[in-house]
């Protein structure tokens, strides 16, 4: 069954229930070996952070928080999969309802709150996966951990995921964990990166191999914050930047049903804001740190815009909820055409 036929049924369900049902259906299709007949693997070799990717279109964190559906999702044609956000201990997240569709704007508001089964369960799932491509693991802090002790949670997760990840994302930009975004600014960011990077370097020595570490930031940054973060990325030799997470802005949805719900806004309305932040970071980083662009990508053209803004690769999430899995192929094809045109 095509996603276009399935979508009206799913959109009549509670969003969180629809999310779980979709993943379960995808898993069943994978086990029945049906996905390979529907979706083709897209090849557009890309190098980023010293890693080789089959194509530059990845799955953003949040869709598969516990790494339960890696093999099924990989069959949709992604060049890489990012799982999480995962925390040291399991947590239920915020109270329901906590996920809202804004259909008129192809947008989503969520206040999930890092609901997950804990880092140890995620590692078990990653180990079981047969997928041979790159798997990023997105790590965060538990809600009960004071923000001044956040480094302890990140290091706890870092220690456990290091030998199992292709790259590790330090998520300090979710708006749904109290005070988490404070870690994006000033001394708090410097101290956090200093602690995490020291442990990261120790792990590289202990294991004898290097796993890239990236930082995921919000779109709601001032130019001064962008400058500071860019300097810190270079100072601490961070391997990549994911820009961006969801926004607290309600521009474009303020008068729509559910537009006033608390949480982070994703989907089409965040696209321009995300692209602006990518442009600002690209200018300040001067090519020293690669950028993975995410936010508001719902077409091949939008994917190319992220690359034109300075991104090396992109990630999808909300756009795929509205457009379906074919969006992966559309983005790879658009980027391929863009690259070919650049070489003429």
Curated annotation (Swiss-Prot):
It holds the Pfam family DHO_dh. Pathway: Pyrimidine metabolism; UMP biosynthesis via de novo pathway; orotate from (S)-dihydroorotate (quinone route): step 1/1. Keywords: Cell membrane, Flavoprotein, FMN, Membrane, Oxidoreductase, Pyrimidine biosynthesis. GO terms for molecular function: dihydroorotate dehydrogenase (quinone) activity. Substrate binds at residues 65, 110-114, 171, 176, 245-246. Belongs to the dihydroorotate dehydrogenase family. Type 2 subfamily. Monomer. This is Dihydroorotate dehydrogenase (quinone). It comes from Psychrobacter sp. (strain PRwf-1). The gene is pyrD.
């Amino acid at each position: 069954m095509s996603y276009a036929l399935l979508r009206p049924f799913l959109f009549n369900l509670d969003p969180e229930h629809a999310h779980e049902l979709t993943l379960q259906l995808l898993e069943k299709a994978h086990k029945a070996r049906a996905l390979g007949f529907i979706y083709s693997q897209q090849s557009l070799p890309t190098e980023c952070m010293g890693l080789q990717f089959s194509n530059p279109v990845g799955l953003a964190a949040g869709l598969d928080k516990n790494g339960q559906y890696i093999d099924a999702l990989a069959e949709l044609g992604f060049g890489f999969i990012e799982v999480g956000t995962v925390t040291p201990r399991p947590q239920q997240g915020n109270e329901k309802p906590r996920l809202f569709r804004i259909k008129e704007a192809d947008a989503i508001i969520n206040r999930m709150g890092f609901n997950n089964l804990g880092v140890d369960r995620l590692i078990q799932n990653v180990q079981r996966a047969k997928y041979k491509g790159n798997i990023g693991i997105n790590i965060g802090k538990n809600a009960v951990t004071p923000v001044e002790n956040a480094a302890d949670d990140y290091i706890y997760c870092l220690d456990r995921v290091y030998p199992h990840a292709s790259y590790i994302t330090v998520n300090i930009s979710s708006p749904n964990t109290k005070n988490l975004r404070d870690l994006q600014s000033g001394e708090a960011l410097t101290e956090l990166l200093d602690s995490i990077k020291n442990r990261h370097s120790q792990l590289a020595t202990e294991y004898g191999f290097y796993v890239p570490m990236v930082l995921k930031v919000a779109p709601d940054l001032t130019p001064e914050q962008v400058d500071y973060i860019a300097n810190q990325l270079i100072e601490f030799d961070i391997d990549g930047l994911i820009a961006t997470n969801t926004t607290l802005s309600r521009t474009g949805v303020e008068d729509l049903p559910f537009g006033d719900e608390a949480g982070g806004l994703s989907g089409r309305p965040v696209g321009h804001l995300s692209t602006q932040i990518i442009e600002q970071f690209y200018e300040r980083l001067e090519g020293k740190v690669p950028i993975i662009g995410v936010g508001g990508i719902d077409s091949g053209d939008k994917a190319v815009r992220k690359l034109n803004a300075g991104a090396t690769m992109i990630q999808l999430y909300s756009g795929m909820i509205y457009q379906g899995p074919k969006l992966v192929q559309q983005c790879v094809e658009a980027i391929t055409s863009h690259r070919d045109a650049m070489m003429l």
